[in-house]
Curated annotation (Swiss-Prot):
Modified residues (Phosphothreonine): 122, 125, 199, 383
Location (main, coarse): membrane
Entries under CDD domains matching the protein: C2A_Synaptotagmin-1-5-6-9-10 (cd08385), C2B_Synaptotagmin-1 (cd08402), Syt2_N (cd21964)
Organism annotation: Homo sapiens (Human)
Protein name in UniProt: Synaptotagmin-2
Amino acid sequence: MRNIFKRNQEPIVAPATTTATMPIGPVDNSTESGGAGESQEDMFAKLKEKLFNEINKIPLPPWALIAIAVVAGLLLLTCCFCICKKCCCKKKKNKKEKGKGMKNAMNMKDMKGGQDDDDAETGLTEGEGEGEEEKEPENLGKLQFSLDYDFQANQLTVGVLQAAELPALDMGGTSDPYVKVFLLPDKKKKYETKVHRKTLNPAFNETFTFKVPYQELGGKTLVMAIYDFDRFSKHDIIGEVKVPMNTVDLGQPIEEWRDLQGGEKEEPEKLGDICTSLRYVPTAGKLTVCILEAKNLKKMDVGGLSDPYVKIHLMQNGKRLKKKKTTVKKKTLNPYFNESFSFEIPFEQIQKVQVVVTVLDYDKLGKNEAIGKIFVGSNATGTELRHWSDMLANPRRPIAQWHSLKPEEEVDALLGKNK
């Protein structure tokens, strides 16, 4: 028993582990770290050597390469500086405008007794626009006129008295004004005053009458438009006065001044078209003009039709040498004539003459009114000149072509200019 007790008192020894014991003290890693450092230095040296090799291959001296690098650096710095400056200025401007707008908004709110946010926004908008100059309305002059309505005769009398302070549209610092008077919307009757030469303060003193029932007068607008007459081109509008008749008390005569307003350019009135044929035989010295037909002529009669016929004048240097005319076609705006007329013109004179074609409305009782006019010749323009040139380029062959009719005064002015 004693032996057993002694055996149990023997100390218990732990079994040995298989793991190796770590040495006590600092670990020497100098070998590994030294190897890594050497490899990085080698790589850097190789890259440096490669870079210098590439630079040496460039066919430029070292100072040139340095200069290029300096210039590139300066450009880069300049670009960065400009971008920064622009951004700073923009922020500063936005901040300033915002502060100014808020200040104006607050002022507007104080003046109006504390309005809502919409009023503050309006103040901001007005504050931003303070620097902009307001465009002054153009001064076109003024017109004095009179109105008088005869209730028994259902007749409106319009007096065009005078104009003042008109703008100068001619080269000499003046204008040649006249007035067109008509009622909208129909424009059935259009009057014109006489042209007053070289003046900016014309005295017209002319009256015009319109037969209009009083019940219909309220739906009409009186227009008095002042134009500058030009003999050789389209007349320019100076300004106009519009008077809605439903705004006027016609119980007594009216006389007043009104400022001229900018008027819309008047579209050229469509007068219709005419088809003519030209044929010239140089050896015989014979010019044949055939009036074939016309279409879409202007309505001249009360019934909405016309009684058209055509006059042909052979002219030279502004003088009428010969005259011919067609028969009258009754009550039509699209007459068919097919009538030919011959003129004896030597070849050496053919470039010196003009053929003037006028379409007129026949009136049994009164004067025959011209609907429109054209002329062909070597001094014509547009389709008229082309027609004449085609005729001369194709002797003995009839050449037909359509022409748009023009106002009589416009063609007469061109003929006078070409004398």
